[in-house]
A protein has these predicted regions:
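Active-site beta-loop-alpha junctions enriched in small/polar residues
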Residues: 124, 153-157, 220-224, 287-289
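A conserved hydrophobic secondary-structure block that centers on an alpha-helix together
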Residues: 122-155
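Aromatic- and acidic-residue-enriched carbohydrate-binding clefts of CAZyme catalytic domains
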Residues: 156-210, 225-264, 293-317
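An active-site-proximal structural segment forming one wall of the substrate-binding cleft
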Residues: 143-148, 201-222, 226, 253-285
Length: 321
């Protein structure tokens, strides 16, 4: 509901916040250069958690007494701040807005329709530097999205530093030139790509968390594993992989289900990922598995017979379990 009049944000306005949302106050100051936390009557922006509100629900009140944002959780308060920024002059997003600024009187109570509001970012096929990922996260925050599905591994590359298997990223993160992976585009003598160190990934996770975004990593398997199969062929079934095609067409891009050593590698991978990503989810893709490789693999066929499995779908279920 819009009222009559405007509240003026000026150099004397301060941001007052509960301790649990101090990060949001700091975030808001990056757009509006205000001081904090000494309350001035009728000239402050108040950020507070109100447990009576839903998980990401918020209320935003702007009147002659100031600006008050309450949220049921950190995420609710952050959503309210996004709405406040969108009510201010658009120059706030270029960090060039000058005080004073007027914002209309309003009373807003809002909550998301969906708990999961996600964006999938595929950095396996096209590597993006950390700053670009943070730029995407900022756009997500503007849109009040809260899940970043981080597609880190596919046929084209391996982008995650692993302490136990450093060659996965050192060799699997690059294409062309002297790299083991052939280029998908461009000249063969040009090496390109990259990977993310664990410190860089933790930085991305923290940056996203401040903006109410959970980062969910994806390591695509048992299919979509061409790059890893080239640099670590032991994961594949027992016939020579074809490295002439690296754009996902080659069917030999699947983990061998019959190799017990593969499950130890996967466990090692997951152990390192959970130390980097606090998300309760680690996505493993599971899509577009070419069962033809397992059909040609004598070890996989033997396993199917031993377990009484019928077809690739049941063999994949065995792998996942």
């Amino acid at each position: 509901v819009q009222g009559k009049g405007c509240f003026t944000v000026d150099t004397n306005t301060v941001i007052v916040s509960d301790s649990e949302v101090e990060n949001i106050a700091d975030y808001l100051r990056t757009y509006i250069p205000l001081k904090g936390n000494n309350a001035i009557e009728n000239n402050n922006i108040s950020l507070a958690v109100d447990k009576n509100l839903g998980t990401e629900e918020y209320s935003l009140s702007i009147n002659e007494n100031g600006i008050k944002i309450c949220g049921g959780t950190y995420g609710g308060v952050f959503n309210g701040v996004q709405t406040l920024l969108q009510l201010l002059p658009h120059e706030v997003y270029s960090k060039s807005a000058k005080l004073p600024m007027n914002v209309p009187y309003v009373e807003i109570k809002d909550k998301p329709q969906y708990d999961y509001r996600g964006l999938l970012l595929d950095v396996s096929r096209t590597f993006q530097p950390v700053d670009e990922i943070k730029r995407v996260i900022n756009y997500m925050a503007y849109l009040k999205l809260n899940k970043l599905h981080f597609h880190l591994v596919d046929n084209e590359s391996w982008r995650v530093e692993l302490k136990k298997y450093p060659h996965f990223a050192l060799e699997g993160g690059f294409r062309g030139g002297d790299a083991k992976l052939h280029p998908m585009h461009g000249r063969f003598d040009e090496k390109y790509g990259g990977y993310y160190t664990q410190d860089e990934l933790r930085d991305i996770v923290a940056y996203a968390a401040e903006r109410n975004i959970e980062v969910i990593p994806e390591i695509d398997m048992p299919g979509h594993s061409k790059a890893l199969g080239v640099i670590h062929p032991d994961i594949l079934c027992n016939y020579k992989p074809n490295t002439s095609q690296t754009n996902g067409i080659d069917i030999r891009n699947v983990w061998c289900v019959a190799k017990e050593s593969n499950y130890a590698i996967i466990e090692d991978i997951i152990k390192e990922l959970v130390e980097i990503f606090p998300s309760e989810y680690i996505h493993i893709g599971g899509d577009e598995v070419s069962f033809a490789q397992w059909k040609r693999c004598p070890d996989c066929q033997k396993l199917m017979a031993q377990k009484g499995l019928n077809g690739g779908e049941q063999l994949e279920q065995h792998f996942l379990n």
